[in-house]
């Protein structure tokens, strides 16, 4: 446990930011899982909609600084490639 006042504040701030970041990351993972479930069911229209939602969620995470833009680009690229395999 920190003794210095600024260190105590850093612990509080870090705890708050960790919770916020965890929430956003969970939303991204959930969106990706929904998309992959639609792919498994081979429902192209639902998969297209879930891909759109997943991409939107990933972009929001980037804008909030939770994930790096290159990480987001890689995730979106892989999801799009999976969709294109099933759609064609």
Swiss-Prot record:
Pfam entry (one): Ribosomal_S20p
GO molecular function terms noted in the UniProt entry: small ribosomal subunit rRNA binding; structural constituent of ribosome
Domain of life (superkingdom): Bacteria
Keywords, ordered alphabetically: Ribonucleoprotein, Ribosomal protein, RNA-binding, rRNA-binding
Disulfide bonds: none
InterPro entries: Ribosomal_bS20 (IPR002583), Ribosomal_bS20_sf (IPR036510)
A biological-process GO annotation: translation
CC annotations in GO: cytosol; small ribosomal subunit
Function: Binds directly to 16S ribosomal RNA.
Family: Belongs to the bacterial ribosomal protein bS20 family.
Protein name listed in UniProt: Small ribosomal subunit protein bS20
Classification lineage: Bacteria, Bacillati, Bacillota, Clostridia, Natranaerobiales
């Amino acid at each position: 446990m920190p003794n210095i006042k600024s260190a105590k504040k850093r612990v509080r701030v870090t705890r708050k930011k960790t919770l916020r970041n965890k929430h956003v990351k969970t939303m991204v993972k959930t969106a990706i899982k929904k998309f992959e479930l639609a792919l498994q069911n081979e429902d192209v229209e639902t998969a297209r909609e879930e891909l759109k939602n997943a991409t939107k969620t990933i972009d929001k995470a980037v804008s909030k600084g939770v994930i790096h833009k290159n990480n987001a680009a890689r995730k979106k690229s892989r999801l799009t490639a999976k969709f294109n395999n099933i759609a064609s």
